[in-house]
């Protein structure tokens, strides 16, 4: 059995929909799935670690990296810049690992144009009320910032139609099961299985 090239997964959601928690639970259960660590100019939040959650850089450094063509995609969200390293992404996929990009719809649009084979997943909250409550419970943002995120969420959620899969995060365990099912189904696609089991298939078919 040989390893197949990994699949790139784009996962997007409005802030507070539970995307990060679902991705962490998925990769805790399946450590062979990797998560791309984006570069950002936003301030580090309590509990975050540079190089783990994000590569935290200055706006000047980010702009220079962009000028050098280091980013596969980049976007500005709430006044902060975010970008995905092109070289690291390709190395991970070539090594046979499935790779998750946690990016917004703007970044997803850019990636799809460059890598149309990528699979995309959008996560929605069960209601606007639930979304507001989750943002409030995080205790990370002021009321003003939360109000801004809620306004932005309506615009963001309208882009779910551009994605391959849609998950409603009402019950966390159920949503996690849906996410795992998407990854498992894609691993069983004929082309990927052919790459993995080429020798076996040749023997079976004589």
UniProtKB/Swiss-Prot annotation:
GO MF annotation: an example: guanylate kinase activity
Protein's UniProt keywords contain Nuclease: no
Domain Guanylate kinase-like: 6-184
Reactions accelerated catalytically: GMP + ATP = GDP + ADP
InterPro entries: GK/Ca_channel_bsu, Guanylate_kin-like_dom, Guanylate_kinase, Guanylate_kinase_CS, P-loop_NTPase
UniProt keyword annotations, A-Z: ATP-binding, Cytoplasm, Kinase, Nucleotide-binding, Transferase
Keyword Metal-binding on entry: no
SMART domains, sorted: GuKc
Compartment(s) where it occurs, according to its Swiss-Prot or TrEMBL record: Cytoplasm
PROSITE patterns referenced in this protein's UniProt entry, alphabetically: GUANYLATE_KINASE_1 (PS00856), GUANYLATE_KINASE_2 (PS50052)
Positions of ATP binding: 13-20
EC number in record: 2.7.4.8
Secretion signal span: none
GO cellular component: cytosol
Enzyme class, spelled out: transferase
Protein's job: Essential for recycling GMP and indirectly, cGMP.
Family: Belongs to the guanylate kinase family.
NCBIfam families, per the entry: guanyl_kin
Name of this protein: Guanylate kinase
Species for this entry: Pseudomonas fluorescens (strain ATCC BAA-477 / NRRL B-23932 / Pf-5)
């Amino acid at each position: 059995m040989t390893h197949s090239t990994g699949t790139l997964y784009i996962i997007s959601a409005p802030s507070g929909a539970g995307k990060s928690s679902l991705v962490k639970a998925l990769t805790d259960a399946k450590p062979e799935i990797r998560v791309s660590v984006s570069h950002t100019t936003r301030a580090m939040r309590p509990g975050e670690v540079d190089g783990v959650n994000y590569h935290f850089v200055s706006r000047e450094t980010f702009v220079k990296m962009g000028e050098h063509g280091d980013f596969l995609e980049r976007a500005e969200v709430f006044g902060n810049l975010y970008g995905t390293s092109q070289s690291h992404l390709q190395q991970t996929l070539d090594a046979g690992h499935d790779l998750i990009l946690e990016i917004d719809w703007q970044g997803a649009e850019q990636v799809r144009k460059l890598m149309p084979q990528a699979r995309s997943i959008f996560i929605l909250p069960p209601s606007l009320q639930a979304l507001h409550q989750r943002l409030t419970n995080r205790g990370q943002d002021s009321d003003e910032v939360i109000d801004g995120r809620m306004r932005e969420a309506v615009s963001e959620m309208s882009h779910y139609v551009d994605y391959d899969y849609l998950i409603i995060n009402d019950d966390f365990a159920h949503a996690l099961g849906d996410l795992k099912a998407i990854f498992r189904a894609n691993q069983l696609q004929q082309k990927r299985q052919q790459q993995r089991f080429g020798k076996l298939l040749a023997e079976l078919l004589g």
